[in-house]
Amino acid sequence: MPVPLGWDDDIPEQPNCPYYQWGRKDPLCPSDGTTLNKDKTLYNSSGNSFTMKRTPGGVSTGTSIKNPTTYNYKTSSPYDWNITTYYDYWNATNGNKTEMNDNSVVKTVYDPNPVGFKMPSPDAFTGFTQNGSNETTASNFNVESTFNNGWNFFTQGWKKGPTDFWRANGYRWYNDSGSLYYVGSYGSYWSAGPSSGMYGHDLFFYSGIVYPQHEGARANGFSVRPVSE
């Protein structure tokens, strides 16, 4: 998919897509499209505005489904929104695998993506640096031009083919009640793979780094960029 899940084309220049906690299906409140880390105004089916609820501590899968607009944050270990550890929320055939891999992802009922799309495998982002490793040296970033609210990554090998723009949507931090951080400066995108009982594999970047093998706490709210099934 050429844009993050839930992207709003009314304000294409700025980050404005919703965030997801690892393994959850429901989107959480996006930023308002500015770089001020401000929540977007939400409206219910009656047209009345409301704010995203924030609840400390872990909850069950069922509780999270019944409360789709609630951010469940954690300030102590384990840093997971769920009171039970699962490894296959976004890949039905994952089992208990936690290592980086390029295994086939089988979509689950918890996958937030539309028909025809699914979560990417953990290795999906490794083409964004020269050797697939976490990089702080700009010459090893597989990008075109300079950082501008995100990176234009090459998509067909090292410095080859067309580019895709990946926005720096910021993230919701698990350790601060799900508050927005670094909108327009940092980008974090989940993969389908867990890296442990507390963390998930993700892509993390800003102007000075590209980490295709990053690990983020599952209770964080990151962006989602799906791939075709």
Model-found features: residue ranges?
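C-terminal, surface-exposed recognition/capping segments
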Residues: V3-D9, P18-Q21, T70, T75-E229
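A short glycine-rich, aromatic-capped structural motif
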Residues: M1-Y87, D123
